[in-house]
UniProtKB/Swiss-Prot annotation:
UniProt protein name: Dephospho-CoA kinase
Enzyme class: transferase
Family: Belongs to the CoaE family.
Function: Catalyzes the phosphorylation of the 3'-hydroxyl group of dephosphocoenzyme A to form coenzyme A.
The species this protein was found in: Chromobacterium violaceum (strain ATCC 12472 / DSM 30191 / JCM 1249 / CCUG 213 / NBRC 12614 / NCIMB 9131 / NCTC 9757 / MK)
Gene: coaE
């Protein structure tokens, strides 16, 4: 990469998006793989032709985007379908992430990858891995508050992700988001100063 890249991750409800938003406010280029995935599967998205070829027109919404409810039902009924979908999306998301990182202008960039440690695909791109962390109880509470999911449903999603202890073990840097937004922003500001002083200096 032309500039250093910080990989930003964390469990569901940890506050990844709020942290990414603050980095963006500080002028850091932020590339979000979830956003890329939505663009690839939106109306006219680059992945839709292959998705239709593999899964048929039944997974396409009226506007030409991926019908997420229909795809979720397919994946739930037959787990091997998830692998077929991932085989289409993951390489495309990675390629677009690399393209955007190479075009990024700034002292360093942040790459938001919810499942950063579940795959080794992104590791070669990164100078640092930053985990936004909070207790599992706080995760459940936050996700329930912002969605209609039950506590059991949230815990099922968490169980499919890397355990919190393993994320923390693999992190280079950690932001503790057990408090409020103001505290999170202060921690992001501190990390930003650290990255400017260390990552950027290392590139000179």
């Amino acid at each position: 990469m032309a500039i250093p890249v910080v990989g930003l991750t964390g469990g569901i409800g940890s506050g990844k998006s709020a942290a990414a938003d603050r980095f963006a406010e500080l002028g850091v280029p932020v590339i979000d793989t979830d956003s890329i995935a939505h663009q690839l599967t939106g109306p006219g998205g680059a992945a839709m032709t292959e998705i239709v070829r593999v899964f048929g027109p039944g997974v396409v919404a009226g506007d030409g985007s991926l019908d997420r409810a229909a795809m979720r039902a397919r994946v739930f009924a037959a787990p091997e379908e998830r692998k077929r979908l991932e085989a289409i999306l993951h390489p495309a998301i990675h390629a677009e992430s690399v393209r955007r990182l190479q075009a990024a202008v700034g002292d360093y960039a942040v790459l938001v990858v919810p499942l950063l440690f579940e795959s080794d695909r992104y590791a070669p791109l990164l100078a640092r891995a930053l985990v936004v962390d909070c207790s599992e109880e706080v995760q459940v509470e936050r996700v329930m508050r912002r969605s209609k999911l039950s506590a059991d449903a949230v815990r099922a999603i968490m169980a499919a992700q890397l355990p919190r202890s393993e994320r923390l073990r693999r992190a280079d840097d950690v932001i503790d988001n057990s408090g409020g937004l103001a505290e999170l922003r202060l921690q992001v500001d501190a990390k930003h100063s650290y990255y400017l002083a260390n990552l950027v200096k290392a590139m000179l």
